[in-house]
Amino acid sequence: EQMKYNLTDDRVFGKMYYGNLVDFIDEDKLEEAQNKIKEQKESVIVYGVGAGLVSHGDVYVYFDMARWEIQLRYRKGMANYNVDNYDEDILKKYKRGYFIEWRIADKHKEKCFECFDYVVDTNKSKDPKMISKDTFKISLHQLSKQPFRTVPYFDPGVWGGQWMKEVCNLDKDQSNYAWSFDGVPEENSILFDYDGITFELPAMDLVLYQPKELLGEQVYSRFGAEFPIRFDFLDTMEGQNLSLQVHPLTEYIKKNFGMSYTQDES
């Protein structure tokens, strides 16, 4: 019910949620959980979304996952947070994530940067990896000062062609590839090498943790901790005609979707 206004009745379009994780927390139950922990004589593990609101404890671990991996898990039947919508239309799952869950999670994550002791890469199921807070911070600080690229991902679509399949050495069993998301920090990830071990973080971590260093003062002052450019490539070779891309004016996108800026394509 609390999300109804932002979810809307539309299959794809929603409205941005600008609240916080605490908006969905029952204060009485939170206090009850905190009191239970205080009463315990032995070690207690608190886990789950917003566990840090209950207690930071002696060791605070943040579990991280890129949004592309989240989308892939939606397709495999994973539900949105705290909702039994396992079989729901993937576009509706994505809408709930894009307009509500990811906004809340980003705000919560920003507050966690100075609190957690370790970060866990959960992008590969049953193969988690962990780094310390210091390693996390040093890595992102260094990255903000040098050239880098995000991990691309490819997806089929209505107009999809065959060119990327050959040039990028992609799965030949796929019917086509329409999209190559090559520089969309909100959804792409970044790979780090630590003594031969590959560690994956959402590229949004860099945007949120080092926004001024990454974007520059002028861009940051206009857009805040968001990456306002999306680099993606479309393949129609031996495919269908590209769909007509229509983007609203700034006033319209603010009024109807709660978004602070629009986009143009070239």
Can you name each region flagged by the protein language model?
Residues 3, 21, 30-37, 70, ...:
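Generic structural signal of hydrophobic/aromatic residues within well-ordered alpha-helices
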